[in-house]
UniProtKB/Swiss-Prot annotation:
Post-translational modification: Contains 4 disulfide bonds.
UniProt key word Signal: yes
Role of this protein: Probable neurotoxin.
GO CC annotation: extracellular region
Tissue specificity: Expressed by the venom duct.
Lineage: Eukaryota, Metazoa, Spiralia, Lophotrochozoa, Mollusca
Name by which UniProt lists this protein: Conotoxin Cal12.5
Species assigned in the record: Californiconus californicus
Subcellular location: Secreted
Record family assignment: Belongs to the conotoxin O1 superfamily.
Molecular function in Gene Ontology: toxin activity
Signal sequence interval, chain numbering: 1-21
Domains: entry comment: The cysteine framework is XII (C-C-C-C-CC-C-C).
Keyword Lipid metabolism: no
Length: 63
């Protein structure tokens, strides 16, 4: 029963990936931690984006 609960919790957290924001966006794509990037703009650096703050400096926050 304990193992089942742990597996369920892990499966629920899996889509959020890096809560610490260690992933970097590629141009024009979204990565598993929910970081959004526009196609022709610079993307985020490690630590600037996480599932809690999904927009990066130099991408969709720009005018």
């Amino acid at each position: 029963m304990k193992v089942t609960c742990v597996l369920v919790v892990l499966l629920l957290l899996l889509p959020y990936g890096d809560l610490l924001g260690n992933s970097v966006c590629d141009f024009g794509s979204c990565v598993h931690n929910g970081c959004y990037c526009e196609e022709h703009r610079p993307c985020c650096t490690p630590g600037s984006c996480s599932s809690w703050w999904p927009r990066c400096p130099g991408s969709m926050m720009d005018p």
